[in-house]
Amino acid sequence: DKLVDEAVSVTSRRYLTADVHTPWQIFHGLLALRHNFKLKINNEKSSAMKWVQSGPSYQGLPLIEQTVHGGRFHPFTVPYAFEGHPNQFLAILSMSELPRNFTFRAGNGATITVDDMLRNAQAECNDREEVTWTLWSFARYMHPGTQWNNRFGEPWSMERLVQTEVGKRVQEGACGGCHGLFALSLARNAYLQSGFQLQGAYLDADMKIKRYIAETRAYQNADGSF
């Protein structure tokens, strides 16, 4: 679409600056432009992905931390600084189709991989926090039948993550619930692509997705706007 291409072209000419703009801002640029996103670093334009890999810090705090269970991006501190939701940055980077052995440098100098971050996310998984971005990440990297125990010994699975997200009210979700519906769509699509017939939590997810597609279309104007 010409308008989409024009929007991408215009946006690509806006450069954020490392150490000025926050990791939260920079990661949203990565969500849109992925490997093509560039930052201003010391007045030169450089790959934002390589900047993330290099283990930078923001306001004295490391972007990437080594943990007992693997690694993670720095969790929430204040709004719009680091992650706004558990595993948000991992979910964003999953859209760039990074391999599981893709490496990052942690603040302590350790080498952390995508797989390390996935393992930490499994260990920290719980139903007291948002699971949207965890589901988003796992749907990109894990088989729909994956099961594990978190660090408290509680049993989890991809299906339980899907069911937890299905049970959340769309209106109460971040950004009007669109992220939750997107995560459910990723998980449902991966389930179907693995050769399964929709059933259980995945059937519930499919019904919820279709319901809100229908509701959205009902509010759409003839010119495509809302």
What label would you give each PLM region?
Residues 1-226:
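Preference for long, amphipathic alpha-helical scaffolds in soluble/luminal domains
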